[in-house]
From Swiss-Prot:
Gene3D superfamilies assigned to the protein according to its UniProt record, in alphabetical order: Glutaredoxin
Protein's UniProt name: Probable glutathione peroxidase 8-A
The protein's Enzyme Commission number: 1.11.1.9
GO molecular function, one term: glutathione peroxidase activity
Transmembrane segments: 18-40
Length: 209
């Protein structure tokens, strides 16, 4: 069988040729957009779709926290806000966790260079001084081109970039950010939002029984 059209297509005018080229470009652009959108949804559709590194250098899939409410915080041991924030975070973790809520702490040295220690030193200090029992991950960057992808998702979702240590993002069970707080906002202002989200989780689980 011979090809249906063995000869080059002849255009009746230059305008027709330009139109075909333009339409082809639009089609290719559309296909690329669809593929990119699918990739973004697969790789970064929610906070729990990312992987991070724990304090011992091991990969941790954040999907293990899916179904819980998470308060994600950039911590720093040498920050003036450290004591008040660590103690209030531990209190929230003790009160509402661990079945339905957790605090996820990410040390960062980008604000005032107030977290210069190693992962082991950071974790030991938090446990010794403040009785921290919530997860502490490897030290990361949250600003600039080297920002941790999971943190970049939080920033992109809220359009609010942390300006200092102990910036807090509340993530719902589906991995979407529902609220954020600055470091000077007290645990009392956070507790009602966490309590409300935890109640919703408990009610949903009861309905599914």
């Amino acid at each position: 069988m011979e090809p249906l059209n063995p000869y080059p297509v002849k255009f009746s005018s230059p305008k027709a040729k330009v139109s075909v080229v333009f339409l082809s470009m639009l089609l290719c652009t559309g296909i690329l957009c669809v593929l990119q959108l699918g990739f973004l949804r697969a790789k970064g559709g929610d906070f729990y779709s990312y992987e991070v590194t724990d304090a011992k250098g091991r990969a941790v899939a954040l999907s293990k926290y899916r179904g819980k409410a998470s308060l994600v915080v950039n911590v720093a041991s040498g920050c003036p806000h450290a004591e008040a924030n660590y103690r209030s975070l531990q209190e929230l973790h003790r009160e509402f966790g661990p079945s339905h809520f957790t605090v996820l702490a990410f040390p960062c040295n980008q604000f005032g260079e107030s977290e210069p220690g190693t992962n082991q030193e950071i974790g030991a200090l938090a446990k010794r001084n403040y009785g921290v029992t919530f997860p502490m991950f490897s030290k990361i960057k949250i600003l600039g081109s080297e920002a941790e992808p999971a943190y970049r998702f939080l920033v992109d979702s809220t359009k609010k970039e942390p300006r200092w240590n102990f910036w807090k993002y509340l993530v719902d069970p589906q991995g979407q950010v529902v609220k954020y707080w600055r470091p000077d906002e007290t645990a009392e202002s956070i507790r009602p939002e966490v309590a409300s989200l935890v109640r919703q989780i408990i009610m949903k689980k009861k309905e599914e029984l």
